[in-house]
Amino acid sequence: MISPDNNVTFILGPTNTGKTFMAIERMVSYDNGIIGLPLRLLAREVYDKIVVKKGKLNTALITGEEQIIPPRARYFICTVEAMPTDKLVDFIAVDEIQLCNDYERGHIFTEKLLYARGNIESLFLGSDNIEPIIRKLFPHSKIIKKKRRSKLSYIGKKSFFSLPKRSAVVAFKTIDVYN
């Protein structure tokens, strides 16, 4: 049975709209929480930020490669696959929930979508393309739409060293970045 959607909010929008930042800020406003992120390096980056705000003894990092779990941790920053299922927390967030559609990892994101709930608040972040499914599964949930704050554009092939500040490099293979 799908968990009730009375405390579930979806934040949908394109990349670079502040969805993850919003979830982090919401989590640290509670006494405890769990956030599931799609990438190990992103989990590490968020962990480092939460440690500054809440302290090393209160913050755990759980990924497939790293486990830093202080005995009294209250905030758990994880890859989605590594999110603990035995912890009752006030807040839960899952980032990039549209990965429910992913062939390899979709079952994990779908499980979190259907069953992961915070006692007070549950946030699911993702792109707009998941909205039709959300509306069918969670007809009473709140959906917040975010718009991109800055322009994203393709500037063609450039030397890595000649990129303007705040540029993003998108590649499907590491070797493509070096080429």
What are these regions (language model features)?
Residues M1-N6, M27:
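Phosphate-binding P-loop
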Residues L12-G13, I24, V170:
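Residues at the beta-strand->loop junction immediately N-terminal to the Walker
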Residues N16:
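Walker A (P-loop) phosphate-binding loop of P-loop NTPases
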Residues K19-T20:
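Conserved lysine of the Walker
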Residues D31-V46, S122-L125, L163-N179:
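Conserved strand-helix element at the start of the C-terminal RecA-like helicase core
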Residues G33, F91, Q98-S159, R166:
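Post-DEXD/H (motif II) to motif III coupling segment of the RecA-like Helicase ATP-binding lobe
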Residues R44, I50-L88:
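Inter-Walker segment of RecA-like/P-loop motor cores
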Residues V80, D95-I97:
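Walker B catalytic acidic pair
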